[in-house]
Each structure stands twice: as structure tokens, then as C-alpha cells.
């Protein structure tokens, strides 16, 4: 099941400014991510497991530039 994009509760970090942020919505075992500057644009959807693995990689520095 995918996130219902019409009724989704989109959230963004309180640390972000008004220009250029990602928004995240969760529904059950699904997580959706979109660009806040283009809310009607493409949306990436992940399982909760995939999203947790991505966040762990960010925290662990897996995606940092050398």
C-alpha cells in the first residue's frame, strides 16, 4: 500500500528555511518524500524499513563526501 498523497500529513524539519527542503509523510509501513518547493512534483516512496536504513546511513556518515 502506498501513502495517500492527497490526505498525507507532510512534515519538514523545523531547522529548515523556507527555500529548498524535503517533506516527509508516513502512512502505516510506507514513507513518502517530496521537494517542498514542488509539492505537486514527483514523490519517492519507501517502506519504513528502507527509510530507517537510509536514516541510519545518514547518521553513520555513509553518504558523506570524502
What are these regions (language model features)?
Residues 1-66:
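Positively charged, low-complexity terminal tracts
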Amino acid at each position: 500500500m502506498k501513502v495517500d498523497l492527497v490526505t498525507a500529513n507532510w512534515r519538514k524539519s523545523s531547522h529548515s528555511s523556507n527555500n529548498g527542503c524535503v517533506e516527509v509523510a508516513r502512512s502505516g509501513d510506507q514513507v513518502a518524500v517530496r521537494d517542498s518547493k514542488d509539492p505537486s512534483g514527483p514523490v519517492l516512496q519507501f517502506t519504513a524499513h528502507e527509510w530507517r536504513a537510509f536514516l541510519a546511513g545518514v547518521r553513520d556518515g555513509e553518504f558523506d563526501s570524502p
